[in-house]
């Protein structure tokens, strides 16, 4: 049984055992584009990836399944070298603890995503970045574009273009990096990990 066959079985829920860790060769490969129309397996895989993110953000399910919380997952992280990513970025509660009007600022499965334009301005998360495929903490600014325009296909073969900034832009760039065999810590300056370049946006 292939990896994708196992992952897309009806009863299977993606968990941390399915996620490969740094050092695995698939994480350093350039993933293949998917062809349209998608296979049923490719559609189901995208749905399972999104389901994993929802479970990881649900305190009850995360504890039950022993999941690390995540806002993005790329197919290579589950040992499927295809250009598929899922992103699920929740909106925060307001100052009084009320739930947001919209639960998510970004919720999508992207097939063959491609950055087609980006800002000159760079950005990095103040607290650095983490990754479900990296079990250690790696400190330093992960320097990325502050704003990006991304083209992608949905599961129905419809083409979309989205413009992202801030945390959403960071998340999508992190996941697209996985499709190109790039890990987040590749973008940290080893000599000066917390250097702030002129004009760089530091996101809290």
From Swiss-Prot:
Protein name, per record: Peptide deformylase
Top-level EC class: hydrolase
EC number(s) recorded for this UniProt protein: 3.5.1.88
Name of the gene this protein is made from: def
Domain of life: Bacteria
Source organism (scientific name): Streptococcus suis (strain 05ZYH33)
Catalytic activity as recorded in UniProt: N-terminal N-formyl-L-methionyl-[peptide] + H2O = N-terminal L-methionyl-[peptide] + formate
Source species taxonomy: Bacteria, Bacillati, Bacillota, Bacilli, Lactobacillales
GO annotation terms (biological process): co-translational protein modification; translation
Signal sequence extent: none
Binding site for Fe cation: 131, 174, 178
Molecular function GO terms recorded: metal ion binding; peptide deformylase activity
Cofactor: Fe(2+)
């Amino acid at each position: 049984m292939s990896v994708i066959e196992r992952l897309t079985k009806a009863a299977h829920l993606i968990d941390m055992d399915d996620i490969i860790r740094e050092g695995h060769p698939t994480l350093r490969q350039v993933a293949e584009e998917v062809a349209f129309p998608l296979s049923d397996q490719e559609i189901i895989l995208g749905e399972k990836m999104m389901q994993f993110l929802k479970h990881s953000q649900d305190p009850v399910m995360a504890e039950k399944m022993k999941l690390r919380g995540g806002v993005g997952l790329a197919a290579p992280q589950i040992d499927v070298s295809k250009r598929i990513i899922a992103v699920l970025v929740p909106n925060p509660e307001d100052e009084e603890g009320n739930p947001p009007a919209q639960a998510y600022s970004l919720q999508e499965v992207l097939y063959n995503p491609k950055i087609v334009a980006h800002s000159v301005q760079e950005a990095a998360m103040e607290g650095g970045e983490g990754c479900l495929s990296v079990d250690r903490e790696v400190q330093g600014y992960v320097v990325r574009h502050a704003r990006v325009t991304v083209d992608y296909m949905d599961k129905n073969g419809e083409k979309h273009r989205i413009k992202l900034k801030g945390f959403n832009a960071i998340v999508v760039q992190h996941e697209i990096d996985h499709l190109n065999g790039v890990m987040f810590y590749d973008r940290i300056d080893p000599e000066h990990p917390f250097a702030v370049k002129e004009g760089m946006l530091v996101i809290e």
